[in-house]
Amino acid sequence: MSNRILRSCVALATLLLLLASGCSRKSDSARNTVQIKGSDTMVNLSQAWAEQFMKTHPGTSIAVTGGGSGNGITSLISSTCDIAEVSREMKESEIALARQKGVEPTKNIVALDGLAVAINAANPVNQLTIAQLADIFTGKVKNWKELCGREGRIVLLSREVNSGTHVYFKEHVLRHGNAEAKDEFSPEALLLPSSQAIVDEVTQNTDAIGYFGMGYITPRLKVVKIAVDDKSPAYAPAIELIQKNIYPISRPLIMYTKGAPAGLTKTFMEFIRSPEGQEVVRKMDFVPVP
């Protein structure tokens, strides 16, 4: 009887040691992994950073998932990612919720971007003011003949509501940066799941207009020059104009971490802000941080 008890105790002790060893391996593995979630605008850039970083840091894993800035923020708040990549600032309500969950969001500007407004290559429009853009996307202007004399009902393309690009465009174009304004996208606007989907539709549809980060610009479509008003010069998005805050629809691209970055997350963030990391920004057609 005592021998059976002794054998059972030995077996139990062995099992506990194996479990502890497994937990230790998981813990070690976790320290070698960084989970990034969020902005569709930033996903290709972050994947390029991750690939470059892992070449010089063997044994590490940087996992990048899109889904929109809102998805990244939700994941950061619920502690299911290490970094939320976003193309807009976190809202006060989101920061408050994060703090309730014991998460202190720390803002890290990692690149700059200009929102390009694009139309089909066959469209004769060359430039628009911010006010004209607002009238187009709120539905006040419905036909291209009101702008260029060419008949054609405007097809509005927008990102989905959980997209930071959607939120930024609404706040800074439709609402002209006025926090008290209530202007919304026209209910006729087609909400597409990615910037690439907007690019593809604009390329095919002669009456379409859409917006996306400048990293998605392609020769297959026309980028409209944007002016602050009808008395101001119009500009297309360009690196030097965005760094000098001259292009009217410029924004920072941000990575939020849980408190100050630490461990592998800190090492990865330091790489991003290094000359090597900022060269990746340039190669991906975004704008390096000055």
Task: Say what each PLM segment does.
Residues 1-33:
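Short, low-complexity disordered leader/linker segments with a strong preference
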Residues 23-290:
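Exported/periplasmic ABC-transporter solute-binding proteins
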